[in-house]
Amino acid sequence: MKSRLKSYRRKKLGLATVIVFCSLCFLFGFYGSTLLSQNVPRVKPRLRMLDMVENGEEEASSMPHGVTGEESIGSIPFQVLSWRPRAIYFPNFATAEQCQAIIERAKVNLKPSALALRKGETAENTKGTRTSSGTFISASEESTGALDFVERKIARATMIPRSHGESFNILRYELGQKYDSHYDVFNPTEYGPQSSQRIASFLLYLSDVEEGGETMFPFENGSNMGIGYDYKQCIGLKVKPRKGDGLLFYSVFPNGTIDQTSLHGSCPVTKGEKWVATKWIRDQDQEE
């Protein structure tokens, strides 16, 4: 009887010891992790923004409002407008002063906009397709640094090296001028072999437009593709130009095939005028 009682007490004592030991481990782990975590900076939840990090340095918190700098982290707010095509809108991408500086630089060199002709097309039978005027300017040719700033920011927003971009095409659309629906990508079956391909386009709106002048995507989300679409119609998803805002859209899928829903155009300006800086981005380095 006594031996059974001793055995029972040993089992009871052993169970109590295990419970106490586990409790101490829990408390040590809980408070230990709390103390250790006090020296670790808190990570704020990410908003729907693109982080810009330069020089490989990353800060845990953003800079105060109104402060900027080349060695700082910043954020580029954006809004997804469409997944078919992939179109992203960037409000306040450039300042009004930067936009005006770009316009002033481009004004003196404007010429009627030209078209890349497909097989069978001529300047005569495509007359009226694109009625704007424009000029090509590289970032290094603009003395105020506005285009250089925009080009670097586009590279950070797209995560594509700036050397993959063509020179800026600065365009002016006056009353009634427009650009019928078209693709920025060059289909080899229509244009012949290409040494590199346009994969994305970035539009920086340099002015407000009182009426008209929207960038439109008639095939957005697959709409209007089977109705015998007239390429002069201004229908589908429309983006109203606002000074300083940017629009990015992709012409190809990640596998390199053409996104048919990236068809787009510029609606006729019905009041005022429209200024825009276009940056075409290619799949290969353009400086080689």
Swiss-Prot record:
The chain crosses the membrane at residues 13-33. Its cofactor is Fe(2+); L-ascorbate. Pfam families: 2OG-FeII_Oxy_3 (PF13640). Binds 1 Fe(2+) ion per subunit. Its EC number is 1.14.11.2. Its main location: endoplasmic reticulum. Belongs to the P4HA family. This is Probable prolyl 4-hydroxylase 9. It comes from Arabidopsis thaliana. The lineage of its organism: Eukaryota, Viridiplantae, Streptophyta, Embryophyta, Tracheophyta.
